[in-house]
């Protein structure tokens, strides 16, 4: 398993938890909670693949269904702690956002698209799953609220390409870019509220 695949699976796990956790807090049944988690985990990547002219990734590899299932078991097993702690959603959402941004950029590079497409696809991969989650839960999507969400993905994409320009190896580039998205998202929520 290469580093980008590991990021993809960890991102799937984290985003699925964020969706399942919110669905459980809204008293969805188990099947509904799993569906929300799965859509959160694969929604952005599915839109990305369709725009890039590729078959959706999860239709070629059952492991994404399995990873989402493990996320479901994690939330069910620790539901008393996961649902009650407000910051659990935020933490898993930030991690998924950062990791999926990098996965989206890397996939765009692999099929030969230029930098600006990579940044857009990274942002879409990171943010669209959360947007679909919020729509399913009848919430205003985070991307449209005062939170710094898509901007964090764009900044991470720029950092990714800066690392490439500096000839850093692939794994450190991916790690730095993912961490930058996570850090920007966390700092923005802790320290800053965007203008009304």
Predicted regions and their residues:
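Structural signature of hydrophobic alpha-helical transmembrane segments
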Residues: 2-10, 57-69, 115-124
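Helix-coil boundary and interhelical linker segments in multi-pass alpha-helical membrane proteins
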Residues: 1-3, 50-58, 105-117, 163-172
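Conserved small/polar residues in nucleotide/adenosyl-binding loops
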Residues: 192-196
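Cytoplasmic-side transmembrane-helix entry/capping segments in multi-pass membrane proteins
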Residues: 32-36, 62-64, 86-96, 145-151
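Short, structured motif recognition centered on aromatic/hydrophobic residues
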Residues: 35-39, 46-52, 120, 124, ...
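Ordered, amphipathic secondary-structure segments that act as subunit-interaction surfaces
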Residues: 71-107
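Small-residue-rich segments of transmembrane alpha-helices in multi-pass membrane proteins
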Residues: 37-42, 94-106, 148-161
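Loop-to-transmembrane alpha-helix initiation sites
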Residues: 61-65, 114-119, 145-151, 169-178
């Amino acid at each position: 398993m290469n580093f980008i695949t590991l990021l993809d699976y960890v991102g799937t796990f984290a985003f699925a938890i964020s969706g399942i956790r919110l669905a459980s807090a809204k008293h969805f049944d188990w099947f509904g909670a799993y569906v929300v988690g799965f859509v959160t985990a694969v929604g952005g990547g599915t839109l990305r693949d369709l725009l890039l002219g590729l078959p959706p990734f999860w239709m070629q590899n059952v492991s994404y269904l399995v990873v989402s299932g493990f996320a479901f078991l994690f939330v069910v097993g620790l539901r008393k702690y996961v649902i009650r702690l407000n910051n659990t959603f935020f933490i898993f959402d930030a991690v998924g956002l950062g990791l999926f941004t990098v996965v989206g950029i890397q996939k765009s590079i692999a099929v030969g698209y230029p930098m600006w497409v990579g940044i857009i696809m990274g942002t879409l991969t990171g943010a669209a799953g959360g947007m679909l989650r919020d729509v399913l839960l009848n919430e205003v999507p985070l991307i449209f609220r005062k939170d710094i969400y898509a901007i964090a993905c764009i900044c991470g994409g720029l950092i990714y390409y800066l690392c490439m320009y500096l000839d850093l190896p692939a794994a450190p580039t991916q790690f730095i870019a993912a961490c930058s998205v996570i850090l920007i998202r966390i700092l923005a929520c802790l320290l800053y509220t965007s203008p009304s």
